[in-house]
From Swiss-Prot:
UniProt GO cellular component terms: cytosol
Cell location: Cytoplasm
Protein's name according to its UniProt entry: Argininosuccinate lyase
Signal is among the record's keywords: no
Domain of life: Bacteria
Keywords, in A-Z order: Amino-acid biosynthesis, Arginine biosynthesis, Cytoplasm, Lyase
Signal peptide residue numbers: none
Similarity annotation: Belongs to the lyase 1 family. Argininosuccinate lyase subfamily.
């Protein structure tokens, strides 16, 4: 198998010139990052090809050496992707594993690749490229989740359900309106992703260790070759910066919080006590002892992964909070946090998209529950303001008395007699019963962004044009 570790010197071949002996085994273990940063192999090779091409263009290395380097790097890419590459912990990281293998393939020309470059700007480039690509994947995944909610919202724009505050029945809404609330939430997540891509669209390569380089490089050329808008403007900040990683983790934490809230509602709604939805077999599990069980494990695991993603954000914030400018080895701890959060977020979005698409909405159960808990009480208060001319606070008090009477009688507001209501306030007429149904309540909420089916369809159309 191809091996990036054929060098037998006691000290590392890339930086061992001033060392008389190699590192202790414990030092080698704590120092090595190849176990996780090998995930950056494609970005590292892509960056090195762009760098070598620029060096040749500027006459810093020969065209012949550039061609050898590019061919060797392409060979290494094939070896890694086919599983034929042996990663060596002794070589610390992905950069030196690739460079060592390149040297074994093409000889001395490999040593010219690192001209005008440091691992400090190299890793900043690799990691930034990876995060940028992950953000693009996240944007696509969120678009799919938004699309799933738009489909359900369109299907249920007029399906009445109870709206809750404090998890207590509040006012009737439509399931379509509730779905559109999640569209707004995940739409904001997607906007944050897009803004983050703009923020990080600058190429670090060429900043070198921290001071730039005396070689006549063209950083604009490499930036363009790597798909960046422009190069970074300050070499010290370039190698100091992990804002792009922190911003990714912040976005991931907020999105995961939204996913967790959705997961919580799915768990609640799927219980027999609520019965608002029926989960598909594809996103449920059973019990090893209770044959009747159908557990919402996917939703529960998404809810749990939120804590894991939040933990990654806090971990990296803590790593970065006390560092002086330029590179410190502490920053090696950035990647595992981002890689783990990215994997968790990607899986969580996919799981929730599947659950939303496949779940069965039980409109009959939703409608039956919508009228419980005196959910049209606000409609009575509003009617008293409009038709009887009461100030809202007085109408609120009158309605509260009506609710108390209904509780005493064990009935709904709509089941009180006109005489009952007029005993509380004689201005009430029989027209009040027109507003005490859940359908009338929902239909009346025609304010911009409201739950009336016509308004929900406007919200859906607005988002369809942008998804």
């Amino acid at each position: 198998m191809a091996d990036g570790s054929s060098e037998t010197k006691s000290s590392n071949q890339m930086w061992g010139g001033r060392f008389a002996s190699g590192p202790d085994a414990i030092m080698e273990e704590i120092n090595a990052s190849i176990g996780f940063d090998k995930k950056l192999y494609a970005q590292d090779i892509r960056g090195s090809i762009a760098h070598a091409t620029m060096l040749a263009h500027k006459g810093i290395i020969s065209a012949e050496d550039k061609d050898k380097i590019v061919h060797g790097l392409e060979t290494i890419l094939s070896e890694i992707e086919s599983g034929a590459f042996d990663f060596s912990r002794r070589l610390e990281d992905i950069h030196m594993n690739i460079e060592a293998r390149l040297a074994s393939l093409i000889g001395p020309a490999a040593g010219r690749l690192h001209t005008a470059r440091s691992r400090n700007d190299q890793v900043a480039l690799d990691f930034r490229l990876w995060v940028k690509e992950e953000l693009q994947r996240t944007e696509k995944a969120l678009t799919g989740l938004i699309g799933a909610f738009l489909d359900r919202a369109e299907e249920h724009a007029g399906t009445v359900m109870p709206g809750f505050t404090h998890l207590q029945t509040a006012q009737p809404v439509t399931f379509g309106h509730h779905c559109m609330a999640y569209v707004e939430m995940f739409g904001r997540d997607r906007s944050r992703v897009r803004h983050a891509i703009e923020h990080m669209d600058e190429s670090p390569i060429g900043a070198a260790a921290l001071a730039g380089t005396g070689f006549p490089i063209d950083r604009h050329m490499t930036a363009k070759a790597l798909g960046f808008r422009e190069p970074t403007r300050n070499s010290i900040d370039t190698v100091s910066d992990r804002d792009f990683a922190l911003e990714f983790l912040s976005i991931a934490s907020i999105a995961a919080t939204h996913l967790s809230r959705l997961a919580e509602e799915i768990v609640i709604w799927s219980t027999p006590q609520f019965g608002f939805i029926r989960l598909s077999d594809a996103f449920s599990t059973g019990s090893s002892i209770m044959p009747q069980k159908k557990n919402p494990d996917a939703a529960e695991l998404v809810r749990a992964k939120t804590g894991r993603i939040n933990g990654s954000l806090i971990a990296l914030l803590t790593v970065m909070k006390g560092l002086p400018l330029a590179y410190s080895k502490d920053m090696q701890e950035d990647k595992e946090q981002v890689f783990d959060a990215a994997e968790s977020l990607e899986l969580a979005i996919a799981a929730m998209t599947g659950m939303v698409r496949d779940m069965t909405v039980r409109a009959d159960r939703m409608k039956a529950a919508a009228g419980s808990g005196y959910s049209t009480a606000t409609d009575l208060a509003d009617w008293l303001v409009r038709e009887a001319g009461l100030p809202f606070r007085d109408a609120h008090h009158v309605t509260g008395r009506a609710v108390a009477l209904a509780e005493q009688k064990g009935c709904d507001l709509a089941d009180l007699s006109l005489a009952d209501l007029q005993a509380i306030n004689p201005a009430i007429t029989d027209k009040v019963f027109d507003v005490l149904t859940v359908e009338a309540s929902v239909a009346s909420r025609t304010s911009f962004g409201g739950t009336a089916p016509a308004e929900v369809r406007k919200q859906i159309a607005w988002w369809r044009a942008r998804n």
